[in-house]
């Protein structure tokens, strides 16, 4: 089985109906539409009311199968990248598998925060090779609103909820290919972006860690990390592919902050016209951001078959992942 045999056959996305604007947040905390927009590029975000990570991911999986000539029983593998699962167990992927009736599928979750979807592309490829399987669904899904301190303007204004995904097939049909990848982890910087610290309530625990479920972030440290490591990762992946940045038709980057994306474009010496943005409408949706954006670009025919695209995620861990592919 060749690396080039892996194709994205379909894309899909799902998001809560409820929209929260910057002006609404300004009634809850010391902020304003102008303050948020200037610093992040975000105007509004989707926030779950009754939706869950598993329900949105199930919607994505259902859409993907409906776009194909497959049934749920033809799916061999389901992977979900998330840092905001419904439960620690069962996994979101197992819930999706049960919800859609994909009885033969292996299912597992991936926790690499905002890089999770790109890490997932690598892992799905390797799993299909190892198990000699054919059809996989990869989804990035998040309900980050449950990890937010809604009185903290430094984090509450940044994040949103949603899910996006792809149907991957290892087939020789001429519908694009994975070309190269670059994955990296800087665990020594992990303390600059944390969420979901649960502590240990056991009466036998001798070191009682604090219960701190909400996002905490050093914005300046994360910014510095991103604008250095993401261009390096993209350039390394392009070098493996024997391509230049100018030969990429579209850069599908994690939607963390408009300023970060603009700086990455500058570092690569590529026009912002090749860096589509949807953070203004969705905020930062972590592992869901790249597949949601990819689905929008495919549906709008901005990305077409044969286009060379660079997918890059970056964030908690701290982690970076880049995949170069021909769509």
From Swiss-Prot:
<dbReference type="InterPro" id="IPR013751">
    <property type="entry name" value="ACP_syn_III_N"/>
</dbReference>
<comment type="similarity">
    <text>Belongs to the thiolase-like superfamily. FabH family.</text>
</comment>
<dbReference type="Pfam" id="PF08545">
    <property type="entry name" value="ACP_syn_III"/>
</dbReference>
<protein>
    <recommendedName>
        <fullName>Beta-ketoacyl-[acyl-carrier-protein] synthase III</fullName>
        <ecNumber>2.3.1.180</ecNumber>
    </recommendedName>
</protein>
<comment type="pathway">
    <text>Lipid metabolism; fatty acid biosynthesis.</text>
</comment>
<keyword id="KW-0276">Fatty acid metabolism</keyword>
<dbReference type="GO" id="GO:0004315">
    <property type="term" value="F:3-oxoacyl-[acyl-carrier-protein] synthase activity"/>
</dbReference>
<dbReference type="InterPro" id="IPR004655">
    <property type="entry name" value="FabH"/>
</dbReference>
<comment type="function">
    <text>Catalyzes the condensation reaction of fatty acid synthesis by the addition to an acyl acceptor of two carbons from malonyl-ACP. Catalyzes the first condensation reaction which initiates fatty acid synthesis and may therefore play a role in governing the total rate of fatty acid production. Possesses both acetoacetyl-ACP synthase and acetyl transacylase activities. Its substrate specificity determines the biosynthesis of branched-chain and/or straight-chain of fatty acids.</text>
</comment>
<keyword id="KW-0012">Acyltransferase</keyword>
<feature type="active site">
    <location>
        <position position="284"/>
    </location>
</feature>
<keyword id="KW-0808">Transferase</keyword>
<keyword id="KW-0511">Multifunctional enzyme</keyword>
<keyword id="KW-0444">Lipid biosynthesis</keyword>
<dbReference type="GO" id="GO:0033818">
    <property type="term" value="F:beta-ketoacyl-acyl-carrier-protein synthase III activity"/>
</dbReference>
<dbReference type="InterPro" id="IPR016039">
    <property type="entry name" value="Thiolase-like"/>
</dbReference>
<comment type="subunit">
    <text>Homodimer.</text>
</comment>
<dbReference type="InterPro" id="IPR013747">
    <property type="entry name" value="ACP_syn_III_C"/>
</dbReference>
<dbReference type="Pfam" id="PF08541">
    <property type="entry name" value="ACP_syn_III_C"/>
</dbReference>
<keyword id="KW-0275">Fatty acid biosynthesis</keyword>
<dbReference type="GO" id="GO:0006633">
    <property type="term" value="P:fatty acid biosynthetic process"/>
</dbReference>
<feature type="active site">
    <location>
        <position position="114"/>
    </location>
</feature>
<dbReference type="GO" id="GO:0005737">
    <property type="term" value="C:cytoplasm"/>
</dbReference>
<feature type="region of interest" description="ACP-binding">
    <location>
        <begin position="255"/>
        <end position="259"/>
    </location>
</feature>
<feature type="active site">
    <location>
        <position position="254"/>
    </location>
</feature>
<dbReference type="GO" id="GO:0044550">
    <property type="term" value="P:secondary metabolite biosynthetic process"/>
</dbReference>
<keyword id="KW-0963">Cytoplasm</keyword>
<keyword id="KW-0443">Lipid metabolism</keyword>
